[in-house]
Amino acid sequence: MSKNFGVDSSQIDTLLEKLRLASGIKGKAMLDTYVQFAARYLINSDAQELAQLDFEELTADVEQAWSFVQERKTSRPLVRLDQSERRELGRATPITTLRVLLDDKPFIVDSLRQALLRHGAAIMEVRNTVLFCGRRKAGSKAEGYGRFGQLAALSNSVDDDFSVEAFCSISC
């Protein structure tokens, strides 16, 4: 199911199965899309970083990221800041996560990261991926996909019906 980039494949497969069971998503097709998204979102993560995260915190992060990519109405970038807490050594540390979804552009993650660093942000983790998204506008026919609307499917490669979108999540 997974390739080994930053995370051991058995580690990511175990996490994906736990996420599948915890998701509460109805319908096999959408559940499979959710697991595919989670795999793409987590695959470049540092193995030690993932091992240290509490499963509930990781689940919340994946759920927030999944919720964020659900609808894209225009070609303008989507940007959102999420606030949360991370528990470390018995104390809560506030976390701000910048999430950005836009048409795929080279070096976008590095540009965002550098801008945050220039403004004094202490970056804790960066997760980014390229998504091949099949979207449908409300009320549109069931066959075929477009660039905008509700996320209906993900692909593993470029396809004429799927838009290429860059998604990144930077926690400070």
Identify what each model region corresponds to.
Residues M1-A121, N128-T129, R135, G139, ...:
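Regulatory modules associated with amino-acid/nitrogen control
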